[in-house]
């Protein structure tokens, strides 16, 4: 059941900036007026967050290594965390990888089946992204069928093979631990990696065919961890128009020059830079080289990152919040959300103006999270 409410007294972040005019919702949409009055003085109402890439849901599916929960129950728990952090639309980034375990094809099937089973019972709008390892050429047919069967609308291409070590005939770092963690013999794991590495010459031709097939089906495509302008240009030629977490300013600038969307990690902003020496998200924001921020592995970072960028003067609040709302919605082609304009989905979050803690989250006009004084006022 959707709410019919008229919020008064709060600061409201609309497309033109903050104001104190009332905000009404009804029928799952932002409306021009009407609804039961709710005084939210002392709070700020912001567009609901759109998380364009996050794998933080994984820990709800396996709280401890090897301790798999019921997938559906785990996704319900993940939604609770999303809602508590003001996220109204979330893209679950699921691997389809030779790495096995929670990144393997079998687990990807379980996640998609679990999502299909609980989606109708959730308030947060959940979408799936498939992270495809380009080296798995022999799986491309199965991957295309998987994408079609599960109606996946967003695919990102990755390559996590340690090519430098494999080319030099060295044993990749941490190989034994990684293999044992997924129940695979380390020597067989190494042999598989070597076989995939040796078959990389097959990737360009096969990837061209796969990307063309996905493009015809209307699938949005992106690449992960671009390191150079050349790499970004190559991905653009294949129709992968999203640069997800480019590792260098050069790659990001190439994306901007080519009209591609740039996604960076919100934890990178919260930390003040990359944890592994890659491009700094705050610097990229200052240069105008970010279209959307993603939670990556930490859902609370989205809200914190937007406020940090505004506090640092790199954006005003409207510009900073755009990176976690309208920006990612636009990249995903979700034109019905991301701002608090009449006619848009009633996706919003309410934060305490003093502490900036989330007090309420509403997705599609339905409450997904409610706490404290805001709860007392809405219920009352």
Residue ranges and their predicted role:
Residues 10, 324-326, 330-331, 340-380:
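C-terminal cap of metal-dependent C-N hydrolases
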Residues 48-52, 90-92, 126-130, 153-159, ...:
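Hydrophobic faces of well-ordered beta-strands that scaffold small-molecule active sites
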Residues 130-141, 225-229, 234, 242-244, ...:
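Active-site glycine- and acidic-residue-rich loops that bind
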